[in-house]
Amino acid sequence: MDQKSDNAGKCPVAHTVPKGRSNRDWWPDQLDVQVLHQHSGLSDPMGKAFNYAEEFKKLDLEELKKDLHALMTESQDWWPADFGHYGGLFIRMAWHSAGTYRITDGRGGAGQGQQRFAPLNSWPDNANLDKARRLLWPIKQKYGNRISWADLMILTGNVALESMGFQTFGFAGGRADVWEPQELFWGPEGTWLGDERYSGERQLDEPLAAVQMGLIYVNPEGPNGNPDPVAAAREIRETFARMAMNDEETVALIAGGHTFGKTHGAGDPSFIGPDPEGGAIEDQGLGWKSTFGTGVGKDAITGGPEVTWSQTPTRWSNYFFENLFNYEWELTKSPAGAHQWKAKNADASIPDAFDASKKHVPTMLTTDLSLRFDPIYEKISRRFLENPDQFADAFARAWFKLTHRDMGPKVRYLGPEVPAEDLIWQDVIPAVDHKLVDENDVADLKGKVLASGLSVQELVSTAWASASTFRGSDKRGGANGARIRLAPQKDWEVNQPAQLARVLSVLEGIQKDFNTAHTGGKKISLADLIVLAGAAGVEKAAKAGGHDITVPFTPGRADASEAQTDAASFAALEPRADGFRNYVSRRRRQFMKPEEALVDRAQLLTLTAPELTVLVGGLRVVFTSRPEVLTNDFFVNLLDMGTQWSPMAEKEGVYEGRDRKTHEVKWTGTRVDLIFGSHSQLRALAEVYASSDAKEKFVGDFVAAWTKVMNADRFDLV
């Protein structure tokens, strides 16, 4: 037969597959452990051998910057450049890439190039930044793996500033891309621009650092669109502080960024199509297609306001402050219907972005006027008005901080434009200036530590307290620097200050004796000794359980000074809860259940679910009659079906386990303990370590996970 059926040549596989409900849909309150397995090698196309730092070193940065300079004025018909220069657009792209950073948990920021992915690529505040990245694609394509998207977006912001006459403070590469969206709590709202993140009298929930869902910081029209500059100033101060910026840095950033470019509110926002993630397949990831006029150039709609701040929007100047203070301002609305302000009785002195024959009167956003009508901001703004050189220096430094805040210590910085000056927000650690200890010294020091009278619990808890401050999000914290001996960490409740002071005193004595006794420049830092003492404690506990092991130790840490430590900044690292130590603060408001806080801290420590599980089991001194022995007793006794658990009426969050037959109390535990028997995935892992043949595996896995935490901030070892 040669008769063709109607289905000839068609794929035999049905493509309309019903979409089922996920486990999260069925059980929305279920503890999410999958966040511990983000950005695995399974999603990375580069392979294990790829080393971005080595690739970046091959980059001809000067050639790349020349290409970026040329791009600034190569206007494209599909997205024309305002004033013939893309500088303002690229500054906004870089700002919004970095500006998601929040100091409370160190998440967000420019470090992974997350602006490429949902939800950030579709936030209302990031409207039309997809065009900025598409303009960059030919350059990214040319330089390939030698420059990540994360680095390229920040570098392009720098080049934009430089191409418009501004002297930047510097640039460091080293931001490696990831290849999937980051699962991150951006707020509880289910709609864009929702603001269900407040409690009490407009108290913003932690760790959030923006006032509404889908905004970087604040609503430029004012709180919830209310055009009140003074009220807006309060929200600016709160959100910028949560991004680690003080008042001077805040003023400099707002004024500096608004020295260039314009906003786009040419028409009613109803003309705008879906965002990139909601667009049609033929749109190829471009969103916000507008049917207003041409949809681009003079007809572009990005947000609501239609504002140009400066008489020279493609050149660095002091016009922002001159206009801010030289005029009185009256409320008006943009063509899009958004609140904005125009100068009273002012001549038309602001150029049009696309018609050289047109001029406009100066305009400002509500949040711009905050810099004049808030008394603290006004004082700073007037100083910058009268001292343009101070303004330029403050903006250069604040911009560098904004774009590098989440990169961690300077040892991670790459490239020829890294500033020589050390800045306190970089959590400076001095270079090691002495000969390091060798294997014989390590053995000798372990012996002295174990003979000092300090218990296994004291040694292990002190090392954990020192190292577990590390945050993989912004690469802060960790054992290097020994900042556990400095304020504020030495006084944190979770660190048991009285015990900590005693342990540190003993270790400092051992350190002093060793350093005094050795000639030839050999020394051990307290940072190294704290970790070494913890290793000695783990080894002793393992030996007591019948396992003769050696915990890996690599010296090379240094001790930071008080002068190198911003105590206020480090206060953000204090845990509200630490499930590894069964700690929940009673004096600070909790935003998560204890078990959620445990997973959150594990994710900050870059731990996997198995690593989380084995560490909790090893660090516990509950569910065992051998508290200073490294055993799997925690898992064995937790999973014992001879025990029945019930909440204690007099202690919230505490449970008692009774013998099912005698009803006698055998154990007490917390939600963090019991989650390893309740949560199906964690229970599966607990069963591995509770098995009769798992004792050796448990010890080996614990030591590996312990060492990972101790070395989490050792970027010099990578």
From Swiss-Prot:
GO molecular function, one term: heme binding
Keywords of the record: Heme, Hydrogen peroxide, Iron, Metal-binding, Oxidoreductase, Peroxidase, Plasmid
Requisite cofactors: heme b
Cross-link entry Tryptophyl-tyrosyl-methioninium (Tyr-Met) (with W-95), positions: 217-243
GO biological process, one term: hydrogen peroxide catabolic process
Residue location of crosslink Tryptophyl-tyrosyl-methioninium (Trp-Tyr) (with M-243): 95-217
PTM entry text: Formation of the three residue Trp-Tyr-Met cross-link is important for the catalase, but not the peroxidase activity of the enzyme.
Positions bearing the site annotation: Transition state stabilizer: 92
Region listing for Disordered, in residue ranges: 1-24
InterPro entries per record: Catalase_peroxidase (IPR000763), Haem_peroxidase (IPR002016), Haem_peroxidase_sf (IPR010255), Peroxidases_AS (IPR019794), Peroxidases_heam-ligand_BS (IPR019793)
Catalytic residues identified in the record: 96
Cofactor note: Binds 1 heme b (iron(II)-protoporphyrin IX) group per dimer.
Residues noted as binding heme b in the record, renumbered to the chain: 258
Known EC number: 1.11.1.21
HAMAP family, per database record: Catal_peroxid
Subunit structure: Homodimer or homotetramer.
PANTHER family linked: CATALASE-PEROXIDASE, HYDROPEROXIDASE I, BIFUNCTIONAL CATALASE-PEROXIDASE
Similarity comment: Belongs to the peroxidase family. Peroxidase/catalase subfamily.
Protein name stated in the entry: Catalase-peroxidase
Organism placement in taxonomy: Bacteria, Pseudomonadati, Pseudomonadota, Alphaproteobacteria, Hyphomicrobiales
